[in-house]
Swiss-Prot record:
Gene it is expressed from: frr
Species in which this protein is naturally found: Shewanella oneidensis (strain ATCC 700550 / JCM 31522 / CIP 106686 / LMG 19005 / NCIMB 14063 / MR-1)
Protein name: Ribosome-recycling factor
CDD domains cross-referenced by the UniProt entry: RRF (cd00520)
One annotated Gene Ontology cellular component of this protein: cytosol
PANTHER family tied to this protein: MITOCHONDRIAL RIBOSOME RECYCLING FACTOR PSEUDO 1 (PTHR20982:SF3), RIBOSOME RECYCLING FACTOR (PTHR20982)
Keyword Protein biosynthesis: yes
One MF annotation (Gene Ontology) recorded for this entry: ribosomal large subunit binding
Length: 185
């Protein structure tokens, strides 16, 4: 029973780390990467559709993304969706392909992004600690039901604390790498 709780807690903490990493990937750095446009929804024949379902997003060079639209009639809708996103991008049309030059980030904008990334990291840490708290409370319920001993609970708390620390360290490493990436000029 305790092993199941421990395994579940580790999986949930891993998911928290992955979710934090995915949230940080959405924060724009000076470099072009296709996941930058993942959150964009396009009005395609009256339905809001993810951009990656109506176009292929690729990297042309370090500061340029290329979006190849599958259906030529959707080029205007894709262009409008990219312009209306809060990313501050300005696509240029070239046939069935849109080229999106990424403007250089100002120092002030970089610092704003670092604040956002730090907030995401803190959210990830809090989620990991919540998983730890839930796991420990589950084991204490088992102790009250006389299904495990007090020593088992103490041992479990120590183990959970160790992998909580390990997962928080992963989040901190992801944060440090993202901060370095953001401050590159």
């Amino acid at each position: 029973m305790i092993a199941d709780i421990k395994k579940d807690a580790q999986e949930r903490m891993g998911k928290c780390v992955d979710a934090t990493k995915n949230q940080m990937a959405k924060v724009r750095t000076g470099r072009a990467h296709p996941s930058l446009l993942d959150s964009i929804q396009v009005s395609y024949y009256g339905t809001m559709t993810p951009l990656n379902q109506v176009a292929n997003v690729g990297v042309e060079d370090a500061r340029t993304l290329s979006v190849t639209v599958f259906d030529r009639s959707a080029i205007q809708a894709v262009e409008k969706a990219i312009m209306s996103s809060d990313l501050g991008l300005n696509p240029m049309s070239a046939g069935a392909t849109l080229r999106i030059p990424l403007p250089a980030l100002t120092e002030e904008r970089r610092k704003d992004f670092i604040k956002v990334v730090r907030a995401e990291a803190e959210g990830g840490r809090v989620a990991i600690r919540n998983v730890r708290r839930d796991a420990i409370s589950d084991v204490k319920k088992l102790e009250k039901a006389k299904e495990c001993t007090e020593d088992d609970v103490r041992r479990f708390e120590d183990e959970v604390q160790k992998f909580t620390d390990a997962h928080i360290k992963k989040v901190d490493e992801i944060l440090a790498a993202k901060e370095i990436e953001l401050m590159e000029v």
